[in-house]
Curated annotation (Swiss-Prot):
<dbReference type="GO" id="GO:0003690">
    <property type="term" value="F:double-stranded DNA binding"/>
</dbReference>
<keyword id="KW-0963">Cytoplasm</keyword>
<comment type="similarity">
    <text>Belongs to the YejK family.</text>
</comment>
<dbReference type="GO" id="GO:0003727">
    <property type="term" value="F:single-stranded RNA binding"/>
</dbReference>
<protein>
    <recommendedName>
        <fullName>Nucleoid-associated protein KPN78578_25800</fullName>
    </recommendedName>
</protein>
<dbReference type="GO" id="GO:0043590">
    <property type="term" value="C:bacterial nucleoid"/>
</dbReference>
<dbReference type="GO" id="GO:0005737">
    <property type="term" value="C:cytoplasm"/>
</dbReference>
<dbReference type="InterPro" id="IPR007358">
    <property type="entry name" value="Nucleoid_associated_NdpA"/>
</dbReference>
<dbReference type="Pfam" id="PF04245">
    <property type="entry name" value="NA37"/>
</dbReference>
Length: 335
């Protein structure tokens, strides 16, 4: 699938001391040559594979106002990117953890959808071996570990302004303060909560199976069906469609799954992004804490794994051979 770059600009923020971030602005746009296209394709791939949160612009968002003017042809893309980088520097300066980086703005098209991607990338040093087998220093953009990135679906934003999912951003690993400063710069707030939608789906599936009075084996088969469909959508980069999922579960009950969720008021969207970590709960139980990590297939509950809620005790019958071997060696050694 081809990625077509419309316009791309790079600027830089350099941290000179604890108080100041120096602004270095390009005087021209980047030429979208083969190297630039390859870089953007890699950034698009890395970003698309990561878990994202969804948002929308606030009414007073300066970035949204400037972007709207740029899209209407009242401002050049380069001028838009330069002004936005200045606002980013001002926002970053409020935080003691502020670091510099390469600031990227790229307007591109992928699969007939227009996007604006904004990222702060680290420019790192490394070593390479040249053709004479000498070691030389080199610099590279750390795209694989990019975590300050947001992407606006311009097509969705302009055709469906009431949407709560046209803006996506990375959330989690970078920490709340970093996420907060970037959201402040974007002038955005969280919109669709994909995790909540997936949790609601899991609850609806269990309730649907219970309403159909399925036995344990049948309930687990339903969960497996749902997981298989959702995982297929996830791998294809597609959203979970309630109507399609309902067709997958046809025959489970006289009432369709889509009808059941609507009647019971689960407030599920007609389509929403799949969340990998939440969906795993359909087929596995997992948890960790206090030096203990446990992970087992859901079908084993009640067969080899038993939980007593009164005493909060988990009993496992038949330990994995490698674990049993470790336990035997440790206990036989008297330690």
């Amino acid at each position: 699938m081809s990625l077509d770059i419309d316009q791309i600009a790079l600027h830089q923020l350099i941290k000179r001391d604890e108080q100041n971030l120096e602004l270095v602005l390009r005087e021209s746009l980047l030429e979208p040559n083969a190297t630039v296209v390859e870089m953007m394709a890699e950034l698009h791939r890395v970003y698309s594979a990561k878990s994202k949160a969804y948002g929308l612009f606030n009414e007073e968002s300066e970035l949204a106002q400037a972007l709207r003017l740029q899209r209407q042809g009242e401002e050049e893309f380069l001028a838009f990117s330069r002004a936005a980088t200045g606002r980013l520097r001002d926002e970053l300066a409020k935080y003691p953890f502020a670091e510099g980086g390469i600031v990227l703005f790229c307007q591109y098209r992928y699969l007939a959808v227009e996007y604006l991607l904004v990222a702060v990338l680290n420019n790192l040093s490394s070593m390479r071996v040249n053709e004479e087998l000498d070691i030389r220093s080199t610099h590279y953009l750390d795209i694989n570990h990019a975590d300050i990135v947001a992407r606006i679906d311009l097509t969705e934003w302009e055709t469906n302004p009431e949407s709560t999912r046209y803006l996506t951003f990375l959330k989690g690993r970078v920490g709340r303060k970093v996420a907060d400063f970037f959201m402040d710069f974007l002038g955005a707030s969280e919109g669709l909560n994909a995790k909540a939608q997936n949790r609601g789906l899991l609850q609806a599936v269990d309730d649907f199976a219970a309403d159909a009075q399925l036995d344990k084996s049948e309930r687990q088969n339903v969960r497996q069906q749902v997981y298989a469909y959702c995982n297929e959508q996830l791998q294809a980069g597609e959203e979970i469609e309630l109507e399609s999922l309902s067709k997958e579960l046809a025959g489970v009950s006289e009432k369709s799954f889509q009808e059941f969720t609507a009647e019971q008021g689960y407030e599920l969207e007609e389509s929403f992004p799949a969340d990998r970590s939440t969906l795993r709960q359909l087929t596995k139980f997992a948890g960790s804490g206090g030096g203990l990590t446990i992970n087992f297939d859901a079908m084993l509950l009640g067969e080899r794994v038993f939980w007593d809620p009164a005493t909060d005790t988990l009993t496992i019958k038949g330990t994995p051979p490698n674990l049993r071997d470790q336990l035997q060696r440790r206990t036989s050694g008297g330690n």
